[in-house]
Amino acid sequence: CRDLAKRHVDEPDVPAAPDGADGYAEWVQIALILYRVELEKSLRETEDYLNEMRGILAVFDLDEAPHYSSFCRWENEYRMRELRRLLRRSAEQAGWSGEAAIDASGFQRDQTSYHYRDRANYSFQSMKTTILIDVNSLAIKDAHFTTQKAWDGHIGMQVFRRNAEDLRVLSADANYSWSDLREECRSNSTRPLIKHREQTPLQKAHNARMNEDYNQRWMSETGFSQLKEDDGEKLRSRSWHGQFRELTRKCIIHNLTQAAS
């Protein structure tokens, strides 16, 4: 976490707490909110744990842990744009080959945001998460989140356009079968391994021809299973935007784990 955070910020050599107990360097803030994901502890538990583990505090160049309210404030301050940059950087650290699969799964929401539910006029207990994952390294390059019903083809197009320059192959099941998405891939020199809906003999033949190369797509399911280990399927943030950020932080920690393995 610390090394990724230092590579991400503009001033990595700033002392961890340049202003004493009231201020912390940007790299420390990023590193600690990511480390809390790895710990899987509450805000108060994280503060207590760090104060008991002086060796870990020393890794972050700290004498004592920040107050638990600081963790909460930092997690709310770092927006999705910043977290996406961290996610892409962590994917590169884990090893990005350009051969990727796209897939979706649901994460259970422990606490529903009633305000958002009323605004959206939609009742939900799970958050649909779509990830772009390297089939060789299991590095997650991008993630898309929604609490509403959305067609996979449209989501796939958004994810592809954000990452087109880093993709050589894109694998997806028939839920993403859309001629526009295939053409978008080809126009960006990306090979689309997207299953057809088997409504005609020709579509069945197309699917049969790509089976050998397509079979690595199951690695996306492995990525989801790793994200959901140790009760990781449940989200604890109260707001929908907080849950988007929470899941993105989980993906970053997943990448760092893959890089270290």
Could you tell me what each predicted segment is?
Residues 17-27, 38, 48, 71-188, ...:
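Polybasic low-complexity intrinsically disordered regions
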Residues 169, 174-241:
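Helix-centered, glycine/charged polyanion-binding patches within enzymatic domains
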Residues 39-45, 231-235, 256-261:
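Short helix-capping/linker segments at secondary-structure and domain boundaries
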Residues 1-38:
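Basic, short loop/linker segments at the boundary and entry of helix-turn-helix/winged-helix-like folds
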Residues 238-261:
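Charge-patterned, long linear interaction tracts outside catalytic cores
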Residues 44-60:
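DNA-recognition alpha helix
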Residues 42, 67-70:
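Short coil turns linking two alpha-helices in DNA-binding domains
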Residues 62-66:
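A short alpha->loop->secondary-structure connector
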